[in-house]
Swiss-Prot record:
Residues 110-169 bind DNA. InterPro entries: HD, HD-ZIP_Homeobox_LZ_Class_II, Homeobox_CS, Homeodomain-like_sf, Leu_zip_homeo. Residues 177-198 are annotated as: Leucine-zipper. It comes from Arabidopsis thaliana (Mouse-ear cress). This is Homeobox-leucine zipper protein HAT9. Gene3D superfamilies: Homeodomain-like. Its main location: nucleus. One of its GO terms (cellular component) is nucleus. The lineage of its organism: Eukaryota, Viridiplantae, Streptophyta, Embryophyta, Tracheophyta. Belongs to the HD-ZIP homeobox family. Class II subfamily. PROSITE patterns: HOMEOBOX_1, HOMEOBOX_2. Keywords: DNA-binding, Homeobox, Nucleus, Transcription, Transcription regulation. SUPFAM superfamilies: Homeodomain-like. Residues 64-96 are annotated as: Disordered.
């Protein structure tokens, strides 16, 4: 029993009579081992010389968990036996790499299960985290040995712990910033009200006319009349003088108010008229 009897694969493309030999189907049927011969034949429709053999015993079923590695390794074995030589170093390295990657994937799937720690392990991890939030490889190895865990599990726990600490600190900062924003909003509203009140007061202020001091002075004739009237009053009754203060300075030519009335006759002194 040779290799050709255990694995007969065929692919025929053609027009006209099938080039398959007559003893092809008989050789396949005479083999007593498991059939591993998936066959595909393309020809003209209605050709009676082509027969497609199908059967449940001709299918090779493999488990899903080992399909990748087994198919790859079997393919390499078939190629090596067909070529009649040994694999090159590059091919051997590729085969080992695929197998190692497969085993790593299996370990990764098993490692994805949630790790349940005891109270003692959790307490020791918390104490270690308080001392050092990050661990170097040596500290990681020592701690993993103490906890009877793998270094990768210790590293993942520290990563998750740092993430939770950062999240809590972010929440605290967010609450503080919210309070600051509320305080600033209230202060802004208060300042806006004060500005509005100041604008209202500015618009409702009474109108005052600014009069310069020169407009409150008397002409020379009025000054003479006022001075003469005060002199005629003499030592009789006391006369009071009222000074008009404009812009912090006394106006020139203060108005004199005498205690006794003085009557002026313009006909007797025509030059005294203004």
């Amino acid at each position: 029993m040779g290799f050709d009897d255990t694995c007969n694969t065929g692919l025929v493309l053609g027009l006209g009579p099938s080039p398959i030999p007559n003893n092809y189907n008989s050789t396949i049927r005479q083999s007593s081992v498991y059939k591993l011969e998936p066959s595909l034949t393309l020809c003209l429709s209605g050709d009676p010389s082509v027969t497609v053999v199908t059967g449940a015993d001709q299918l090779c079923r493999q488990t899903s968990s080992h399909s990748g590695v087994s198919s790859f390794s079997s393919g390499r074995v078939v190629k090596r036996e067909r070529d009649g030589g040994e694999e090159s170093p590059e091919e051997e390295e590729m085969t080992e790499r695929v197998i190692s990657d497969y085993h790593e994937d299996e370990e990764g799937i098993s490692a994805r299960k949630k790790l349940r720690l005891t109270k003692q392990q959790s307490a020791l991890l918390e104490e270690s985290f308080k001392d050092h939030s990050t661990l170097n490889p040596k500290q990681k190895q020592v701690l993993a040995r103490q906890l009877n865990l793998r270094p990768r599990q210790v590293e993942v726990w520290f990563q998750n712990r740092r993430a939770r600490t950062k999240l809590k600190q972010t929440e605290v900062d967010c609450e503080f910033l919210k309070k600051c924003c509320e305080t600033l909003a209230d202060e802004n509203i208060r300042l806006q009200k004060e500005i509005q009140e100041l604008k209202t007061l500015k618009l409702t202020q009474p109108f005052y006319m600014h009069m310069p001091a020169s407009t409150l002075t008397k002409c020379p004739s009025c000054e003479r009349i006022g001075g003469g009237g005060g002199g005629n009053g003499g030592g009789g009754g006391g006369s009071g003088a009222t000074a008009v203060i404009v812009d912090g300075s006394t106006a020139k030519g203060a108005f004199s108010i005498s205690s006794k009335p003085h009557f002026f006759n313009p006909f007797t002194n025509p030059s005294a008229a203004c």
